[in-house]
Amino acid sequence: MDLFDFFRDWDLEQQCHYEQDRSALKKREWERRNQEVQQEDDLFSSGFDLFGEPYKVAEYTNKGDALANRVQNTLGNYDEMKNLLTNHSNQNHLVGIPKNSVPQNPNNKNEPSFFPEQKNRIIPPHQDNTHPSAPMPPPSVVILNSTLIHSNRKSKPEWSRDSHNPSTVLASQASGQPNKMQTLTQDQSQAKLEDFFVYPAEQPQIGEVEESNPSAKEDSNPNSSGEDAFKEIFQSNSPEESEFAVQAPGSPLVASSLLAPSSGLSVQNFPPGLYCKTSMGQQKPTAYVRPMDGQDQAPDISPTLKPSIEFENSFGNLSFGTLLDGKPSAASSKTKLPKFTILQTSEVSLPSDPSCVEEILREMTHSWPTPLTSMHTAGHSEQSTFSIPGQESQHLTPGFTLQKWNDPTTRASTKSVSFKSMLEDDLKLSSDEDDLEPVKTLTTQCTATELYQAVEKAKPRNNPVNPPLATPQPPPAVQASGGSGSSSESESSSESDSDTESSTTDSESNEAPRVATPEPEPPSTNKWQLDKWLNKVTSQNKSFICGQNETPMETISLPPPIIQPMEVQMKVKTNASQVPAEPKERPLLSLIREKARPRPTQKIPETKALKHKLSTTSETVSQRTIGKKQPKKVEKNTSTDEFTWPKPNITSSTPKEKESVELHDPPRGRNKATAHKPAPRKEPRPNIPLAPEKKKYRGPGKIVPKSREFIETDSSTSDSNTDQEETLQIKVLPPCIISGGNTAKSKEICGASLTLSTLMSSSGSNNNLSISNEEPTFSPIPVMQTEILSPLRDHENLKNLWVKIDLDLLSRVPGHSSLHAAPAKPDHKETATKPKRQTAVTAVEKPAPKGKRKHKPIEVAEKIPEKKQRLEEATTICLLPPCISPAPPHKPPNTRENNSSRRANRRKEEKLFPPPLSPLPEDPPRRRNVSGNNGPFGQDKNIAMTGQITSTKPKRTEGKFCATFKGISVNEGDTPKKASSATITVTNTAIATATVTATAIVTTTVTATATATATTTTTTTTISTITSTITTGLMDSSHLEMTSWAALPLLSSSSTNVRRPKLTFDDSVHNADYYMQEAKKLKHKADALFEKFGKAVNYADAALSFTECGNAMERDPLEAKSPYTMYSETVELLRYAMRLKNFASPLASDGDKKLAVLCYRCLSLLYLRMFKLKKDHAMKYSRSLMEYFKQNASKVAQIPSPWVSNGKNTPSPVSLNNVSPINAMGNCNNGPVTIPQRIHHMAASHVNITSNVLRGYEHWDMADKLTRENKEFFGDLDTLMGPLTQHSSMTNLVRYVRQGLCWLRIDAHLL
C-alpha cells in the first residue's frame, strides 16, 4: 500500500502534470514499448510512448511529451532508477517505492534492464495482441494487473522512464521523489518481476486467456461480462469504489489500470474512486503510471501494458485501464485513450488527454497484467496477483478474470520464466503487497464494490480511503478468479480469516453494502511495500511463498496468514468465493510454487481447515468456533469453493496428516452442510503452508485443533457443537464420532485406554472416540455407549453403562466364584480358594464382556441378592458401631434387597444351615460372587462413589468389592489401580466412620486387600478371605458364626461389642526427630491449656510421642541421645501429668481414673523397658558384686555383723555385704570398715536398675486395680486394640494408650 501512498502523493503533485503531459508521456511510453518489445502497436494504434522516457529512453519515445518528462522528472531515468531498484541497499532508502510493486513487476531478468524491459513489455503487450497464446499471468491477475499496471505503469512506467531519465524524473519528483526513488529502486526489483511477467507472448496470451477465461469462468461472456461488470464497477461505483477496485491490486497498477482505457468499460466512476487516493486522485493516469508502479512494474510491465487491447478483447473492448479506471474508457484501442480520460470523478482527474490516458492505460493494462499477476501470484504476490485479477475481473469481465485464471497454461507458459523471476521478486516485495493482494483477491471475488472495499482496506495502508465506489459485483467468474487470489490471501490471513472470512463473505454477499467500507489502514507512505519487500520480504516472502506455493492450490497467493492483516483476511474471504478461479491462475502460481514447494491441491482443503482452525484458534476459542461458523458463512456464499474444497479434501487424504485426511472427508460433509463456509476455509486449506503454520500454532493446543479438525471432520453431524465444545469437550466429540459409526473403534480405543493426547494426536474419529472415552471405566462399553457417549459424556451416564457391564462381568464371575466356592469349604480352603476365585474372576471378567450379559440375568440376579444380603448384614453390623452409619449403606442395600431380599434371606439361611464351615466357605464364594457381583455391587459402589452408596456399605464388602472392582477394571480395560483406588476410597470413608475396633480392622484389611488384589492375588485372597470372614461375621451379627470368628476370636467378640471409634494408625516409620517434633507440639498444646484434665491428657499424649521417639532411638544406634534417657524423661512427664489430677481422691472422676490407668500402664512398660535397656549393666554389676562377696565370704562369716560392733563403720546399705575383712577380722575397735568405691557405685547402679522392674510391676498392679472400676471401657479397648501386657512392644503401648486417650477425649468432649 506504500505504493499507493507514494503515488497518491506523486499523483497529487503530478495531477496537473498528468493532465497536461499525460498524452505525451503515454505516447512516449507507447513508442518505447513498441521499440523495446519490438511489437507492432496492436492495442495502441496511436503508438504513443507513454512510458518510453520514464522507463527507458526509447527511440520512439516522444521526447516532447510533457507527461513523459514529468514522469522522468518524477521517477528519474530508467538506468538510474534501475540501479536504484536493483540495488537493495538503495531500495531500503527508497521509502516511496512500494516493495509490493517492485516484486510484482521486477523480475530477476529485468533488473538490469528495468525500463527497457518495460519497453519490451510494451512490445509483449503488442505481442500479447499478436501472440495471445503466449503464457500470461492469471487472467484476474492480468486484469487487475492491467488496470493496476496501467495506473502503475502510467505512474510507474512514466516514473520509471523518468527514472530512466533520472535527472529529469528525480528533478521533478521533488517531495514525492524520495518515495518515488524508493519506488524506483523497488521498481527495479519490480522490473525483475516484470521481466518475469514480460513475455511478449505472455502478455498477449493474457489477453487471450482473459478472453478465453471469461468464457471459461463463471461469465461465459468474459469480454462483455467482465467489461460490463468492470464498467459497472467503475461507472456505477463511486470513485472510491472504483479506486478500491483498482487499488485492490494494491499498487499503482490500479492507477495504471484506471488510466488504461478499457474499451468496453467506462472507468469514469472508478478512477475518481481510485484517485480519491493520494496519487489516484486527479492524477489517475499518472497515479496509475505512478513511479511506484512504474518502477515496480515498469521494466517488465510497461512493455506488458500493451495487452490492454487484448484485455479489451478478452473483456470485450475493455482495457485493464478502462476496466480499472471505471471511467468511460475509450474503445479498447489506444485511440480511445482520449475517451479514457480517467474519470476525474473524485480526487484525481486523469490527464486531459483521454486518448493518451487511454493509451497509457491500455499499455499499462496490456503490459502490466502479467507482471502484477506474476508478482502477486507468488506467495503474497500470489495474493496480490489474485487480488489484481480479482479487481480486474471485477473491473473487467469476470469472465476475463476467470479466463486469466482459467487459462493457467498460457499464463504459466508465458509467465513461467518471467513469472518465476517476478514471483521471486514478488515474494520479496509481496509482503506489503499481500495486503494489497487481499484486496485484489477480494476484488476478484467480489464485485467492484468488494474490490473497492478490499482496496480501501489495502488503501488505508497506503493511501487514505477513497469514498466507497458502488461497484456492481463482477460475475461469479470474477469472484472465482478473485477467489483464487483471495484463497491464497485468505490463507495468508486465515488466522484472522475465521472472523474476517465471515465478514468478507458477508461482504461478498452484501458487496454493495460493503462497498464503502474500506478499512483505511495507516498508509505506509514512506514505508513502501517495495522497500519492505526488497529488504524484509525478499527472504520472508520467498519462504512464505515457498511454503505457500508449496501448496499447489489453484490459488497462487499463499501468503503467510500472519502477514495478512484482517483486511487481507477479509479480502481473502471475499476471494474465497473466487477460489474456483485458482485452477486457471494455478499454472502461474505453480511456477511460483514450484520455486517454493508445490503441494498437492488435495492438501488445500486440509490446509484450509487447518488454517481456518488455526486462525480461529489464534483469535480465540470462541473465535475459533465463530471462525468456523464464519467460514461456514463464507462457504455458503461460495458454493464453488465448497465444491473445490471437498475436492481438495478428497485429494488431501494423502497429505500432511491423518487429520488432514479425516478433515478432508468430514470437512466435505461439513462444507456441504455449510455451503457458505467452504470458500474461506477452502482458501485456508489451499494454503497448506499456512496450515502447517497453523498446525504449529495448534501445536500448543494441538489436541484442540485436532479436535477441531475432528469436529470439522465430524462437524457435518455436530458442527456447531463441535466448534463450541471441541476444545472443552474433546471427549464429547469423539463420542459423536463414535456415534458416527466408529463404535467398534471407540471400543478398541476405550479398551486401549488411549490417552487424550494420543487420541488427539492420532487422526480419525477413533481418536476422538478414545478421547470421549477418556475414562477407561467406560472403555469396555464403547460399542453400546459409542453412540451414547457422544450425547452422554457425563461420567455418571457412562458409569451407569459401565456398571451394567460390570454386572455382566459379575454374572460370569459368580459362576466362576461358585466353581471356586465348592473347593473353599474349609476356612483355609476358602482362603486358598478365594485367591483362585479372584484370579478366575479376573480372568473370567476379562472375557466376560462378551458373555457378561448372558450370565448377568441369572448369576447376577442371585449374586445381587447375596450382595444385598451381605449388605444388609453388614449394614446391621455397621449399625452396631455408633460411629458407623449403617443406614445410608443399608438404604442402598434395601433398594436391591427389596429386589433380592428373599434371595439374601435364603442365602442367610443357607449360611445358618452350616453354621461354622459352610458359612465361611460360602461367604468367600459369596464374596467371590460378590466380587463377581461386584459388577452389580460395583454398580452400587460406583453409585456409592457417585453418592448413592454410603461408606458403610463399601466397608462391608470392601474386600469383595476390591476383587470385583479389580475384575471390572481388568474387564473394562481399567487398571487395577483404579479399582484399588476406588476401593481404598470407600475404605477410607468406612474407616472414617468406623468406630468399632473389629470394623476398623476389617476395613484396614479390606484396604490392604484392595491393594493386594491389584498386586498379588494370593495375598489378596488370603486377606480377602479373612476379611470376608470377619465382614461376614460383622454382617451376620445377629447370629455370629463362632467358626468364622475362631480365627479371630478376640476380634470377633470385641468387634461385636466395641462401638467406639477406632483410630487409624500409620505404620510408616519415622526418625526420632519426627516424633520429637510431634511430642513437642503436643506438649506445647498441653502447656497452653488451663483445664487440668485436658492438659493431663495432652501431656500423656506427648509422652506417647516421646516414647515413640525413644523407640526410634533404639532402632537407630547412631542417635546421640540414649533411648534410656528419653524414656526416663518421658516417665517424668507422665508422673507430672498424673499429678495434675488426683485419681486417688474420692472426688476423682471416672475419666481421671481411666487416665491414671493409662498412665500407669505406660509407666509400667516404660520402667520395664528401661530395665531392659540397662539389663546388661545390671547383670554386670551383679556379677562384680557377687565376686567381691565371694572373696570375702569366709571372713564375713566369722565376723558377727558389721554393725554389731560399737556401731562404728556401720556399712551403708549398698556395702552391707561388703564388710571389710579388717572390720570382720579385727576387733570392732580395730578400725573402720572400708568398702571400695567401685563396689559402692556398682551396688548403687544395680539397685537403681533393678528398681525399675519393681516400679514397673508396682505401676502395673496399680493399673489393674483401677481397671476394675472401669472394666467396660478397658474391655472395649482391649478388644479393639488387643490386651496390653507387660511384654507388649512400645508400639503397641503407644497405640493402646493413644486409643484410650482418644476415647477419653471423646467422653470429656475434648475433641
From Swiss-Prot:
GO terms for molecular function: G-quadruplex RNA binding. It holds the Pfam family AF-4. One of its GO terms (cellular component) is nuclear speck. The modification Phosphothreonine is found at residue 517. Residues 155-164, 582-597, 655-668, 857-867 have a biased composition (Basic and acidic residues). The modification Phosphoserine is found at residue 430. Its main location: nucleus. Residues 465-477, 883-892, 913-922 have a biased composition (Pro residues). One of its GO terms (biological process) is learning or memory. Residues 669-679 have a biased composition (Basic residues). Residues 94-187, 204-229, 377-417, 457-530, 574-726, 818-867, 881-943 are annotated as: Disordered. Residues 478-491 have a biased composition (Low complexity). It is found in: Nucleus speckle. Keywords: Intellectual disability, mRNA processing, mRNA splicing, Nucleus, Phosphoprotein, RNA-binding. Belongs to the AF4 family. It is linked to Intellectual developmental disorder, X-linked 109: A form of mild to moderate intellectual disability associated with learning difficulties, communication deficits, attention problems, hyperactivity, and autistic behavior. It is associated with a fragile site on chromosome Xq28. Intellectual disability is characterized by significantly below average general intellectual functioning associated with impairments in adaptive behavior and manifested during the developmental period. RNA-binding protein. Might be involved in alternative splicing regulation through an interaction with G-quartet RNA structure. PANTHER family: AF4/FMR2 FAMILY MEMBER, AF4_FMR2 FAMILY MEMBER 2. This is AF4/FMR2 family member 2. It comes from Homo sapiens (Human). The lineage of its organism: Eukaryota, Metazoa, Chordata, Craniata, Vertebrata. The gene is AFF2.
